[in-house]
């Protein structure tokens, strides 16, 4: 594992502009009187890419993470030939998130959701004892399961039974990853409802979805 120093950042309420420190797993501004997202403000104004050895964390200057996790892979940008020729373009570049070894892309879940999962899970305190809860209908569940399994981060997935075929992996998962399912005929909203029932216990905490700055910054 390469040496890593987390970048300094603060959080800002989009509605009010109030800037405040991240207390660890802040998902909103407690002082804001209206619904609003929060966003990150990084001390480094210029993104300095690290070497490819850092995997996804080559972008760490603009990620709200505490540490680097194992087995991360970065998106790959390459100059298009076939599509560029079809469109009559000379300088078309494509950024690819997935599995395509021929161009150096090795995200084994074949999904851009890996970038979100590696960002969110690296924001978690290493001493966190509670179980992370994620509701998903497919790709997000697969990505979080892979990242949490590889790094032994306790995870509870809530997935509709009809979407279980989306949970394929290239190997067995660590027992730290658990699964609950809404019954057949249910959908994503049923999975969310089921996850919210688990969150009534103080042994669990919500990933947060779009409210989690690490989710959005990881995808950017």
Which sequence ranges carry the predicted segments?
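PLP-dependent amino-acid enzyme catalytic core
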Residues: 1-220
């Amino acid at each position: 594992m390469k040496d890593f120093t987390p970048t300094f950042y603060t959080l800002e309420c989009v509605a009010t502009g109030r800037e405040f420190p991240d207390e660890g797993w802040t998902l909103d501004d407690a002082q804001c009187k209206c619904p609003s997202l929060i966003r990150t403000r990084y001390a480094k104004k210029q993104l300095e890419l690290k070497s490819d050895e850092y995997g996804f964390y080559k972008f760490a200057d603009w990620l709200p993470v505490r540490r680097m996790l194992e087995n991360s892979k970065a998106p790959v940008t390459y100059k298009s030939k076939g599509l560029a020729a079809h469109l009559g373009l000379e300088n078309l570049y494509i950024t690819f998130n997935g599995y395509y070894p021929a161009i150096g892309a090795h995200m084994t879940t074949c999904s851009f959701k890996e970038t979100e999962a590696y960002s969110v899970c690296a924001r978690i305190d290493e001493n966190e004892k509670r179980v992370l809860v994620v509701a998903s209908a497919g790709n997000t569940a697969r990505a979080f399961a892979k990242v949490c399994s590889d790094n032994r981060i306790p995870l509870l997935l809530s997935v509709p039974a009809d979407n279980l075929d989306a949970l394929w992996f290239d190997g067995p998962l660590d027992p730290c990853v658990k699964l609950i399912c809404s019954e057949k005929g249910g959908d994503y909203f049923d999975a969310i409802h089921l996850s919210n029932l688990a969150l009534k216990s103080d042994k669990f905490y919500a990933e947060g979805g779009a409210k989690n700055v690490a989710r959005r910054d990881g995808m950017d």
